[in-house]
């Protein structure tokens, strides 16, 4: 994975590659509701138009939390390294964005969503920073 990260050009691709190489492709997304943080597992990301995207169901609490306060953090771990992604997300209602997510994560998403089901919703990181940490190396910072 490290060699894949070093070869990649665009920043978002480095973040996607790291998440795609997580052992079970699970990362954790943190949101806030009032003064209470909420963390839950997620499993799909994609790059669309050079930006990092995540997906959820618009009937879930996480959807409402991100609509009210778009500041989120994600984290995942792989073989002694871990990634933290923090930033601001915004819902992208365009069908093309949902199609990109479905194409990038068909195996994970096709049993839950279709792009036109009025449930599948994608959020784009409008700004953010991903940092890959290790116990043995300096952190690698990726601007989103």
Language model feature labels by segment:
Residues 41-43:
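Conserved beta-strand in the GNAT
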Residues 1-27:
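Extreme N-terminal tail/first-helix region
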Residues 36-37, 80, 133:
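Short glycine/serine/proline-enriched coil/turn segments at secondary-structure junctions
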Residues 28, 52-53, 73, 84, ...:
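General beta-strand recognition
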């Amino acid at each position: 994975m490290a060699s894949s990260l070093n070869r990649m050009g665009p920043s978002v691709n480095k973040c996607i590659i790291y998440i795609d190489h997580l052992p079970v492709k699970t990362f954790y997304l943190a949101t806030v509701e009032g003064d209470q943080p909420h963390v839950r597992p997620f499993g799909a990301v994609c790059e669309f138009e050079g930006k990092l995207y995540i997906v959820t169901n618009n009937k879930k609490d996480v959807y409402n939390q991100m609509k009210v306060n778009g500041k989120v953090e994600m984290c995942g771990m792989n073989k002694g390294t871990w990634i933290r992604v923090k930033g601001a997300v915004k819902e992208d209602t365009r069908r093309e964005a949902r199609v990109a997510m479905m194409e990038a994560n068909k195996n994970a998403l096709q049993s839950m969503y279709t792009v036109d089901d009025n449930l599948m919703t994608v959020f784009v990181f409008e700004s953010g920073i991903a940092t890959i940490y290790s116990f043995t190396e300096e952190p690698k910072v990726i601007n989103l």
